[in-house]
Amino acid sequence: MNGEEIIRFERVTKEYDGTVVLDDVSFAMERGKFYTLLGPSGCGKTTILRLIAGFIEPTEGTIYFHGKPIQNVPPNKRQVNTVFQDYALFPHLDVFENVAFGLRVKKMKEADIRQKVSEALRFVNLEGYERRRIQEMSGGQRQRVAIARAIVNEPEVLLLDEPLSALDLKLRTEMQYELRELQRRLGITFIFVTHDQEEALAMSDYIFVLNKGKIQQFGTPKDIYDEPINRFVADFIGESNILSGRMIDDFLVEFAGKQFACVDRGFAPNEPVDVVIRPEDLELAAPEDGQIVIRVDSLLFRGVHYEICGYDENGNEWLVHSTKKAEVGETVGLRFEPEAIHVMRVEREDEGA
């Protein structure tokens, strides 16, 4: 970690009625970065958010804020604010009073409240909406109000619990850019929870991929997409062709009944492995020129590319994204570079990362 540490979990476990929802998790976060907690429902991502906010306490382990344990610090004393999935706005208050609510609780002077609310609304592009009623706001505008209400208190960390999930696709995409730009302008730490892989890849400095209460992988969006650590991450982050194989030697792997040059090393000879090739890294070719030959089973036009699904002679399914079209029933070749092959160690079902 190169920057200033703001949050650290040391061997944190959370149980509910004997059920482990977060299992011996350790990590650290830097000030001023955009982090995403990504995973399927029930993986533990919202539990981490609630632990940071102080809404729940860990069963085991320690949580640090600026190097000091915070277990006994109540939520209202932590330099943390949360934007909830449903925004949790007050329908009987206008935009100004929703944003000012926390400042009034702190008994701040009226002049200071006006100044801070105006600054917060300017940050989220809602100047002039001060007296608008919440019922008159669109979904995207309500989300901006919720964010303004959170940042007006000048938190060091902003927690966002799936705040885009209720928006339509176009608005969700717009808000991704707005949130990322807001984080850069504010310079505070954002911790964003989502199950949407594209959101995580588009917005984050760093991503935690979680499954079954454990962190499977941590890294930049590019690291996690290009170098998934196991089959779960490869399958969860984008579309993938995942095949069972074995490592013959350094830079030589066998899968789909053939041996291929690759860029991976450090495996035992003949070690069982999982092999990942992304659909966009496959190129259509004539059957005689293909490293793999498939029979096309289905074809979908996705606008920017065709999505082609087929099977090789060993029954392995292949997914291809190509600007070239192939007909259902046609036999085609697939070509790929050694750099497109990613070799992963096989993990047992009960293993974490």
From Swiss-Prot:
Annotated Gene3D superfamilies: 2.40.50.100, P-loop containing nucleotide triphosphate hydrolases (3.40.50.300)
Superkingdom of the organism of origin: Bacteria
Entry EC no(s): 7.6.2.11
Pfam families: ABC_tran, TOBE_2
UniProt-annotated binding residues for ATP: G39, P40, S41, G42, C43, G44, K45, T46
SUPFAM superfamilies: MOP-like, P-loop containing nucleoside triphosphate hydrolases
Reaction equation(s) it catalyzes: ATP + H2O + polyamine-[polyamine-binding protein]Side 1 = ADP + phosphate + polyamineSide 2 + [polyamine-binding protein]Side 1
Sorted UniProt keywords: ATP-binding, Cell membrane, Membrane, Nucleotide-binding, Translocase, Transport
Top EC category: translocase
Cell location: Cell membrane
Ranges in a coiled coil: none
Record's bilayer topology term: Peripheral membrane protein
Domain ABC transporter: 7-237
Family matches, as InterPro entries: AAA+_ATPase, ABC_SmlMolc_Importer, ABC_transporter-like_ATP-bd, ABC_transporter-like_CS, Mo/tungstate-bd_C_term_dom, P-loop_NTPase, PotA-like, PotA_ATP-bd
GO CC terms, sorted: ATP-binding cassette (ABC) transporter complex
GO molecular function: ABC-type putrescine transporter activity; ATP binding; ATP hydrolysis activity
PANTHER family, sorted: SPERMIDINE/PUTRESCINE IMPORT ATP-BINDING PROTEIN POTA (PTHR42781), SPERMIDINE_PUTRESCINE IMPORT ATP-BINDING PROTEIN POTA (PTHR42781:SF4)
Family, as annotated: Belongs to the ABC transporter superfamily. Spermidine/putrescine importer (TC 3.A.1.11.1) family.
Role played: Part of the ABC transporter complex PotABCD involved in spermidine/putrescine import. Responsible for energy coupling to the transport system.
Subunit structure of this chain's protein: The complex is composed of two ATP-binding proteins (PotA), two transmembrane proteins (PotB and PotC) and a solute-binding protein (PotD).
Protein name: Spermidine/putrescine import ATP-binding protein PotA
Biological classification of the source: Bacteria, Bacillati, Bacillota, Bacilli, Bacillales
Gene name of the record: potA
